[in-house]
Amino acid sequence: MEILHDTVYNPAYNMKGQGAPESVVNARPGLDIGAASTWGNAVVDYDKKKLEKAAELLLADYDKLKNSAGYQYDLANVLEQVLSNTAQEYQKKMAAAFRSGDAEEFSTLSDKFLSIIDMVEKVTGTQKEFLVGTWTVSYTHLRAHETRHD
């Protein structure tokens, strides 16, 4: 827990814009990605290796805790952030390869970046809270409720 407090839970590191750093995975493709939204940021000031260590520690207890919904949610959330941090590094390297005209390196890095996106999808797909369908169904129910009370 201390690692999380010193990294992603630390307000000094995760409130630079309108909230926590946004993932480049969610951003419009580009060479210079500052954020996924117009009001956010993609600045990760904490030590990314520390968060990777937290993920390792969570995974080490998988067999003991796999039946805990809270553990599964936290694990998915931490793994998604580790993958997003990794994607950010690859995106920067891809941009550098593109700018230098190194098509082979750009292609290699692009393939790795796309595989990270696939991993993010698999990890977040384990939790209903991360699924788009969950949000659209909630909106539909909320909208129907509002319409009945108008």
Regions found by a protein language model. Give the residues of each.
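Short amphipathic alpha-helical coiled-coil/interface segments
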Residues: 83, 87, 91, 109-121
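Extended amphipathic alpha-helical segments with heptad-repeat/coiled-coil character used for oligomerization
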Residues: 129-139
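Amphipathic alpha-helical coiled-coil segments
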Residues: 119-129
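Short helix-adjacent coil turns
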Residues: 100-105
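Structured mid-domain segments that build the active-site/substrate or prosthetic-cofactor binding neighborhood
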Residues: 1-77, 81
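Conserved small/polar residues in nucleotide/adenosyl-binding loops
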Residues: 140-149
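Conserved, mostly hydrophobic/aromatic
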Residues: 94
